[in-house]
From Swiss-Prot:
One of its GO terms (biological process) is rRNA processing. This is Ribosome maturation factor RimM. The PRC barrel domain binds ribosomal protein uS19. GO terms for cellular component: cytoplasm; ribosome. Binds ribosomal protein uS19. It comes from the Bacteria.
Length: 187
């Protein structure tokens, strides 16, 4: 049983599929059928899973793992999250403006004056675009859009994100707040 130093979530196992130990898997990889290309997958409890076969369906992939040979063994895996070591991800395949979610977590979000708005504690995609979760000491978590207008620059080496606090919704736009205080009347 191996504990990963820098785990990256790759997939979540769903329901069993058929009688031969196959499972439905929600893959978080760019190409869902490439799930096995990153090496063995690991669970948080230290189990190791070798992918033998992957086939694509409409919303998930169907996966067969070594040692999971019947439906009851497959059913026992339902809800299990699978990880790989961060070093197994191919950095050279990324464009200049592409990042792995795992690389963004822990970066400090600062504005142009150096004011900190917290650190990235999560990256989410609920369907309308990526969101970064920021959490600072003594602050509640806040979600900001991960867009070129909100996040102006990413410096992985310095561990910082340069954000526009107005575009990110972290502060109120002074011009808009004046409009709210003195609404115009319509005739």
């Amino acid at each position: 049983m191996t504990k990963l130093e820098n785990p990256v979530l790759m997939a979540t196992i769903g329901a069993a599929q058929g009688l031969r130990g196959e499972v439905r898997v929600k893959s978080f990889t760019d190409d869902p059928t490439a799930l096995g290309d990153y090496g063995n997958l690991h669970s948080e409890d230290g189990r190791v899973f070798e992918v033998l076969e992957v086939r694509e369906t409409k919303n998930v992939v169907i996966v067969r793992f070594r040692g999971i040979n019947d439906r009851s063994a497959a059913e026992a895996l339902n809800g299990l999250e699978l990880f790989i070591e961060r070093d197994n991800l191919p950095d050279d395949d990324l464009d200049e403006d592409e990042f792995f979610y795992a690389d963004l977590e822990g970066l400090e979000a600062v504005d142009g004056t150096g004011k900190s708005y917290g650190s990235v504690t999560g990256v989410f995609d609920f369907g309308a675009g990526d969101l970064l979760e920021l959490k600072g000491p003594g602050r509640r978590p806040v979600l900001i859009p991960f867009t070129e207008w909100s996040v102006l620059e990413i410096d992985l080496e310095a561990g910082k994100l340069l954000v526009d606090p107005v575009a990110a919704g972290l502060v109120e736009d002074k011009d808009e707040s004046l409009d709210k205080q003195f609404p115009t009347k319509r005739k």
